[in-house]
Amino acid sequence: MFDLHKFSLRAQEIIEAGGFLYGAGWSPATSSNYSARIDDANIAITVSGKHKGRLQAQDIMVVDLQGRAVASQMKSSAETLLHTVIYDLKPNVGAVLHTHSVTATVLSRALRPNTEIVFEDYELQKAFRGVYTHEGRCVVPIFDNTQDIEALSALSVEYLKEHSDCPGYLIRGHGMYTWGETMAECLRHVEAMEFLLACELEMMRIKS
């Protein structure tokens, strides 16, 4: 089993994150899914189909790192595996956020057939953990959207094993995944990623 107090704390973090992300326009309607680590074996995650701007305690459930529900009959997102593989691969990660902003959706489509986006010489790259200067490249992969979540999760794991400094990834025409050691850090990464994606989209407009 899991610690109920820790679950309650993580659930509250998820609820507050949902209010912020919905308010920013990055998680419209019932899109997106959020999670936070409870312990080495379990995570708290949003129940499927819930409005992320109006989350309540009963909208958060527990799954193990294989994505199986723990002490619950509720159903988590079909994309739960995309969360659990990150926790399994990165023991230091404490939160994972999947958002559906207009910028991430449009830019990932506009860059087709590119399989990555490169941020370079932006001051805000320093918002990502482990980045201390703008003088460098931050590469974010773009994976094609698919209903085959097992295949997509395997693809993400393969990439992240080879690029341990990667701060997140895009799913083309779908949205973005980011993570952090804490929920606060994860939210910072979302904000930074959204800013940088918006800058890249604006640069494309200027150049066209």
UniProtKB/Swiss-Prot annotation:
Pfam families attached to this UniProt entry: Aldolase_II (PF00596)
Domain of life where this protein originates: Bacteria
Origin species: Hahella chejuensis (strain KCTC 2396)
Cofactor(s) required for function per UniProt: Zn(2+)
E.C. code: 4.2.1.109
Binding site for Zn(2+): H98, H100
UniProtKB keywords: Amino-acid biosynthesis, Lyase, Metal-binding, Methionine biosynthesis, Zinc
Transmembrane segments: none
Cofactor, how bound (note): Binds 1 zinc ion per subunit.
Function, in words: Catalyzes the dehydration of methylthioribulose-1-phosphate (MTRu-1-P) into 2,3-diketo-5-methylthiopentyl-1-phosphate (DK-MTP-1-P).
Pathway assignment: Amino-acid biosynthesis; L-methionine biosynthesis via salvage pathway; L-methionine from S-methyl-5-thio-alpha-D-ribose 1-phosphate: step 2/6
GO molecular function: methylthioribulose 1-phosphate dehydratase activity; zinc ion binding
Catalytic activity: 5-(methylsulfanyl)-D-ribulose 1-phosphate = 5-methylsulfanyl-2,3-dioxopentyl phosphate + H2O
GO biological processes: L-methionine salvage from methylthioadenosine; monosaccharide metabolic process
InterPro entries named in the record: Aldolase_II/adducin_N, Aldolase_II/adducin_N_sf, MethylthioRu-1-P_deHdtase_MtnB
Annotated family: Belongs to the aldolase class II family. MtnB subfamily.
Top-level class of the enzyme under EC nomenclature: lyase
A single Gene Ontology CC term: cytoplasm
The protein's name in its UniProt record: Methylthioribulose-1-phosphate dehydratase
